[in-house]
Regions:
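Juxtamembrane/interface alpha-helical elements of multi-pass membrane proteins
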Residues: 73-186
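Membrane-helix interfacial "entry" motifs
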Residues: 14, 37, 60-65, 96, ...
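Transmembrane alpha-helix interface motif
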Residues: 1-44, 48-57, 141-144, 148-151, ...
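Transmembrane helix-loop junctions in multipass membrane proteins, especially transporters and channels
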Residues: 41, 45, 60-64, 88-96, ...
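Alpha-helical transmembrane segments and their helix-start/interface "positive-inside/aromatic belt" motifs
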Residues: 25, 64-74, 248
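Loop-to-transmembrane-helix entry motif
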Residues: 69-77, 113, 117, 207, ...
Length: 268
């Protein structure tokens, strides 16, 4: 079901990750995502796996929720694996007709697929452990230095957060429309891929209408609360780095340093 997709949802809690400064969480997430692409051997992926699982345990977020964030993208993961397996030249381990699978292709395909899994899973922890309001404040604070160049930091942060928050809302709306049309005899499951795609076309009009209606309701609610952008806006909670943020930065930098060392060691 579309409602099983958890991207953009917040999981309330009081864990170490929940209490971190949003700026620290965003920066640590970006650093670790970049570090994932340094993994080029089984030992590196073992370290990435241990670190990711450790963060999931510390966050208090059920592992099944992290899996739900990865599961909807299984088509992309399988496609990525097949592309590498079937197109990478090297020592052949299987061949049949025009299909040739090499040892290098299998390794590269598995590594790239694992990178995507860790990237999606670790990124989902950011939204699971950070409420939309706090996430907006964190993004705005990180973009503030660019305001001198004319970058509207608050407006960009607000748009990004609203877009992320609307993903589960639109998926829920799509699921509701599909159920309503199925009760009237519509069939979204039978037929080939093209027929299923054509069957989704009638969903577009009511979905767009519902999306614009929700956007209008949100705009009305923001105006009713006298929202006028970031100028002169005060915050109930002031952002401040604490010892837990410094500990998180230290841990992420250590993991990145180890991955970088293993990258050059196994590369040679």
């Amino acid at each position: 079901m579309l409602t099983d997709i958890t991207l953009g949802q917040y999981y309330p809690g009081d864990s170490f990750l929940h209490r971190m400064d949003p700026r620290a969480k965003i920066l640590c997430t970006m650093i670790f995502i970049c570090a994932i692409f340094l993994a080029n051997n089984p030992w590196s992926y073992l370290l990435v796996t241990i670190f990711t699982l450790g963060c999931i345990m510390i966050s208090g977020v059920p592992p099944v929720m992290v899996w739900k964030a990865v599961k909807p993208l299984w088509v992309i993961l399988v496609f990525t694996l097949l592309i590498h397996v079937l197109t990478t030249p090297g020592k052949e381990i299987f061949g049949y007709g025009f299909i040739h699978i090499s040892e290098e292709g299998l390794r590269n395909g598995l590594f790239m697929t694992l990178r995507l899994v860790f990237l999606i899973g670790f990124s989902s922890l950011l939204t699971y452990t950070t409420s939309p309001i706090v996430l907006t404040d964190g993004i705005e604070a990180l973009l503030n230095p660019f305001r001198r160049f004319g970058v509207p930091a608050h407006e960009l942060a607000m748009m990004m957060t609203i877009a992320l928050r609307f993903i589960p809302t639109l998926l829920e709306e799509t699921d509701r429309i599909m159920k309503a049309q199925s009760s009237r005899g519509a069939d979204f499951t039978s037929g080939n891929l093209w027929q299923k795609a054509k069957g989704m076309v009638p969903l577009l009009v009511p979905l767009f209408i519902a999306a614009f209606r929700r956007a209008d309701d949100l705009a009305t609610a923001m105006e009713a609360r006298c929202y006028r952008g970031g100028e002169g806006r005060t915050k109930m909670h002031q952002l401040a780095y604490t010892s837990r943020d410094r500990l998180a930065f230290t841990t992420v930098f250590l993991v990145t340093a180890v991955l970088l060392a293993m990258y050059f060691y196994f590369r040679t």
